[in-house]
Amino acid sequence: FLDNMLRDKKNHRIEEIVVPKNSWTIGKTLKDLNIKEKVGLQIIAILDPISQNYNYYPNATDTILENMTLITLGDSERIETLTKFIN
């Protein structure tokens, strides 16, 4: 899977995006953000900024925290859109 993804001309990659301090998304759930519908990406994991534990199966009810890391898989254009979306 990863070999094919890295060779794909569509420039897919796994990306970690940190939720900034003043993000409007803080305190909202993944369901509230509706990232899959609005941006076209799925959040495949999250890193809790307090415990430093990864959640590889994030739920729609998980709440966004300041400095939380969102891990996604997608093309560079959608990843850039997600970065702007959470800022």
Regions found by a protein language model. Name each.
Residues 16, 21-86:
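Cytosolic Rossmann-like ligand/nucleotide-binding regulatory domains
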